[in-house]
Amino acid sequence: MDPCECSKTGTCNCGGSCTCTNCSCTSCKKSCCSCCPAGCSKCASGCVCKGKTCDTSCCQ
């Protein structure tokens, strides 16, 4: 089960090592998603990006 899927509660419990497969949860976008620009194979669905590099520092 994806700890970051929050379709039932609207929130999720994410640890520092959390790996999201479903990034629709707002509270997970900062702490869990590998945020990459379009075209990056590591980009998690639904991530909000502020940079163009393929690393975790590009997450807002």
UniProtKB/Swiss-Prot annotation:
Positions annotated to bind a divalent metal cation 4: 32-33, 43, 47
Keywords of this entry: Metal-binding, Metal-thiolate cluster
Ranges for region Beta: 1-28
Binding positions (a divalent metal cation 1): 4, 6, 20, 23
Residues engaged in binding a divalent metal cation 7: 49, 54, 58-59
PROSITE patterns xrefs: METALLOTHIONEIN_VRT
Chain residues that bind a divalent metal cation 2: 6, 12, 14, 25
InterPro entries recorded: Metalthion_dom_sf (IPR017854), Metalthion_dom_sf_vert (IPR023587), Metalthion_vert (IPR000006), Metalthion_vert_metal_BS (IPR018064)
GO MF annotation: an example: metal ion binding
Binding site for a divalent metal cation 6: 36, 40, 43, 59
Binding site for a divalent metal cation 3: 14, 18, 23, 28
Pfam families recorded: Metallothio
Coiled-coil segments: none
Region (Alpha): 29-60
Taxonomic superkingdom: Eukaryota
Family (UniProt): Belongs to the metallothionein superfamily. Type 1 family.
Function: Metallothioneins have a high content of cysteine residues that bind various heavy metals.
UniProt comment concerning the protein's domains: Class I metallothioneins contain 2 metal-binding domains: four divalent ions are chelated within cluster A of the alpha domain and are coordinated via cysteinyl thiolate bridges to 11 cysteine ligands. Cluster B, the corresponding region within the beta domain, can ligate three divalent ions to 9 cysteines.
UniProt name for this protein: Metallothionein A
Source organism per UniProt: Sparus aurata (Gilthead sea bream)
